[in-house]
């Protein structure tokens, strides 16, 4: 048991230590420009997305209190599914947000908030890459339902250089 834990820890250190690009949020994120609908191109496997087949979108709407309303939707075998949440700036780097999908009355609990870092962003906000400090989460998002294959490969390579396990990416949309 102990040798398994040591081996697992060594593997994680090696993965993160091998990163040649820093894993950190972008320094400039204009929430008004980021708002709107994004189409998911790819993501790391997550329990809460296990039933999503395709047509995965995230729509962000600015709210008066400086947060963003979040509406995630996807097509499942039984039709469309959706969930609503809130994203809030963390007060640190501009691209560092936290999201929650738990009810508002649970918002005071730290464990209902997840880190949502915009780690790469097209200057014209045509695509974005969202990750987390743990590298457990990774989404490649686009304003259009598909993405140029060359652009995706470049994004994937940079995510790998940041230490993300890109070999596990699940494709959610076609590449052009």
Short names for language-model regions:
Residues 2-3, 7-176:
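A beta-rich soluble binding module of mature secreted/lumenal proteins
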């Amino acid at each position: 048991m102990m040798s398994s834990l040591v081996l697992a820890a060594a593997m994680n250190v090696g993965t993160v230590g091998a990163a040649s690009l820093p894993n950190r949020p972008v320094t400039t994120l204009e929430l008004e420009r980021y708002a709107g609908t994004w189409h998911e191109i790819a993501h790391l496997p997550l329990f809460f997305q296990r039933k999503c087949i395709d047509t995965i979108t995230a729509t962000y709407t600015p709210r008066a209190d400086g947060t963003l309303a979040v509406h995630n939707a996807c097509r499942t075998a039984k039709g469309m599914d959706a969930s609503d949440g809130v994203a809030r700036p963390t007060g640190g780097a501009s691209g560092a947000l936290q999201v929650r999908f738990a009810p508002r009355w649970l918002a005071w609990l730290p464990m209902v908030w997840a880190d949502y870092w915009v780690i790469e962003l097209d200057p014209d906000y045509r695509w974005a890459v969202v990750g987390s400090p743990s590298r457990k989460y990774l989404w490649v998002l686009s304003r259009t339902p598909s993405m140029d294959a060359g652009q995706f490969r470049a994004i994937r390579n940079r995510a790998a250089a940041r230490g993300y396990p890109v070999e596990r990416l699940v494709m959610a949309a076609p590449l052009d």
